[in-house]
Amino acid sequence: MVREKVTVSTRTLQWKCVESRTDSKRLYYGRFILSPLMKGQADTIGIALRRALLAEIEGTRITRVKFANASHEYSTIAGIQESVHEILMNLKEIVLRSNLYGTCDASISFKGPGYVTAEDIILPPHVEIVDSTQHIAWLTEPIDLCIGLKIERNRGYFIKTHANFEDGSYPIDAVFMPVQNANHSIHSYGNEKQEILFLEIWTNGSLTPKEALHEASRNLIDLFIPFLHMEKENLPLEDADHTIPLSPFTVYYKVAKNKKKLSLESLFIDQLEFPPKIYNCLKKSNIFTLLDLLNNSQEDLIKIEHFRLEDVKQILAILGKHFALDLPKNLN
């Protein structure tokens, strides 16, 4: 573990890693500070970076598996202790590192008896195993195990559907996110006129926290570059013939009437610090803002694929704690 004393720059804005450690092959931790910042800037940067870290960084995962002799997902294969479903769940957890673009094929060819681990996966040159000891299956008899794998580099969360089943292969719910969690905190100093941003990052080992921070920052910059190159003369001009003047009273009334709705629309769900699973399931269901969330009932949420009652309870707890809001059991 590497830990440094926190010193605050009083001149140039700069990032600094103040703590770094490797808890295991699949768990890296890093803590960073950014200073000095003007009051309010730390929260703006922290929220944007957390969203980019959790949602915008690409990762590599196994997304499809094909067995030579499996009748269905919940069947068993003679000579293998695990069921097909258990093998799929073990393959889902395999952490990969790559500079892959799109998809590629891999395979497992193993003769029992013995333990099949991630080390036994035959990979293309541009894909690596992060933890070669990850367990896949235990062959108890001298049988041949042949498995075809589809590997994909993507971002976010891939949820299998019935439409994904093809050619006797089995799709896997894939979590592409290399960043397992990210938190930020803000500390004031200098008569509370300046701020320090603390950012904590946990990764699965396919990227270091420093690499993840670099990629998230680069992705944010890429999003804003088009605005920097936008030429004023190319902007659409307002059509003065179709404008309607509003009195100050009318403007005030409309703003007051929609104030609450506007505030809910401007608060995105990534700012609520939901766990990655809840965040991605909500996003897949086209729930992006707090207003979108409040337009659903508890019954609506429980119908979301892969959602459990515990997930709904966690959402209700966060809404109650931070906003004194609740969701109805149903909208009828």
UniProtKB/Swiss-Prot annotation:
<dbReference type="GO" id="GO:0006351">
    <property type="term" value="P:DNA-templated transcription"/>
</dbReference>
<dbReference type="InterPro" id="IPR036643">
    <property type="entry name" value="RNApol_insert_sf"/>
</dbReference>
<dbReference type="InterPro" id="IPR011262">
    <property type="entry name" value="DNA-dir_RNA_pol_insert"/>
</dbReference>
<keyword id="KW-0804">Transcription</keyword>
<keyword id="KW-0548">Nucleotidyltransferase</keyword>
<dbReference type="InterPro" id="IPR011773">
    <property type="entry name" value="DNA-dir_RpoA"/>
</dbReference>
<keyword id="KW-0808">Transferase</keyword>
<dbReference type="GO" id="GO:0003899">
    <property type="term" value="F:DNA-directed RNA polymerase activity"/>
</dbReference>
<dbReference type="GO" id="GO:0005739">
    <property type="term" value="C:mitochondrion"/>
</dbReference>
<comment type="similarity">
    <text>Belongs to the RNA polymerase alpha chain family.</text>
</comment>
<feature type="region of interest" description="Alpha C-terminal domain (alpha-CTD)">
    <location>
        <begin position="262"/>
        <end position="332"/>
    </location>
</feature>
<dbReference type="InterPro" id="IPR011260">
    <property type="entry name" value="RNAP_asu_C"/>
</dbReference>
<dbReference type="GO" id="GO:0000428">
    <property type="term" value="C:DNA-directed RNA polymerase complex"/>
</dbReference>
<dbReference type="GO" id="GO:0046983">
    <property type="term" value="F:protein dimerization activity"/>
</dbReference>
<comment type="subunit">
    <text>In plastids the minimal PEP RNA polymerase catalytic core is composed of four subunits: alpha, beta, beta', and beta''. When a (nuclear-encoded) sigma factor is associated with the core the holoenzyme is formed, which can initiate transcription.</text>
</comment>
<dbReference type="Pfam" id="PF01193">
    <property type="entry name" value="RNA_pol_L"/>
</dbReference>
<feature type="region of interest" description="Alpha N-terminal domain (alpha-NTD)">
    <location>
        <begin position="1"/>
        <end position="231"/>
    </location>
</feature>
<dbReference type="Pfam" id="PF03118">
    <property type="entry name" value="RNA_pol_A_CTD"/>
</dbReference>
<dbReference type="InterPro" id="IPR036603">
    <property type="entry name" value="RBP11-like"/>
</dbReference>
<dbReference type="Pfam" id="PF01000">
    <property type="entry name" value="RNA_pol_A_bac"/>
</dbReference>
<keyword id="KW-0240">DNA-directed RNA polymerase</keyword>
<dbReference type="GO" id="GO:0009536">
    <property type="term" value="C:plastid"/>
</dbReference>
<protein>
    <recommendedName>
        <fullName>DNA-directed RNA polymerase subunit alpha</fullName>
        <ecNumber>2.7.7.6</ecNumber>
    </recommendedName>
</protein>
<dbReference type="InterPro" id="IPR011263">
    <property type="entry name" value="DNA-dir_RNA_pol_RpoA/D/Rpb3"/>
</dbReference>
<keyword id="KW-0934">Plastid</keyword>
<comment type="function">
    <text>DNA-dependent RNA polymerase catalyzes the transcription of DNA into RNA using the four ribonucleoside triphosphates as substrates.</text>
</comment>
<dbReference type="GO" id="GO:0003677">
    <property type="term" value="F:DNA binding"/>
</dbReference>
